[in-house]
Amino acid sequence: MTLPALSIVASPTKRLQILELASEAERRGFPALACPTLGNAFGLCVSLAHVTQRLRFYTAIQGIYGTSAAEIGSIASHIGEVSGGRFALGLGVSHEAMVKRLGVEMGPPLSDMSAFVEALRKQEKFGG
């Protein structure tokens, strides 16, 4: 039987327990962990890179508003490298109410995502 991916959040005051859970999930044969942006997905992914050996993990999802493509590209490249390629970057546009809270004007989602990915790809020579 193929096991599904699990989803975990780096809850404040529970981060060490979450990493222990990830190690246990790997031991039991789960293939991957989804890391929602709730609770700092990038920080969790860096930690997962260091406490697991085979488990794949990914952001689910990292919003494109509020952080530059250059910064996200650099972070994703770092995690990809230290994890031996087990990290995947999941991107999304979120929704208008959330984006407004960031003080950002949301454009057409497909156009915004296309422009973001284009900017992200331009960073490849610097980020890896």
Give each language-model segment a name.
Residues 18, 41, 45, 69-72, ...:
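Aromatic/hydrophobic pocket-lining residues that form the small-molecule binding cavity
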Residues 12, 39, 63-65, 93-97:
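Active-site-proximal loop/turn and secondary-structure-junction residues that shape catalytic pockets
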Residues 21-22, 47-50, 71-74, 102-106:
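Short, glycine/charged-enriched secondary-structure capping and boundary segments
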Residues 1-59:
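N-terminal beta1-alpha1-beta2 module of alpha/beta enzyme domains
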Residues 56-62, 89-92:
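A short, GP-enriched loop/loop-strand-helix hinge that lies immediately N-terminal to
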Residues 2-4, 73-128:
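Internal, glycine-rich beta/alpha segment that forms the wall or movable "lid"
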Residues 62-67, 105-106:
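Glycine-rich "substrate-gating" loop/helix at the edge of Rossmann-like oxidoreductase active sites
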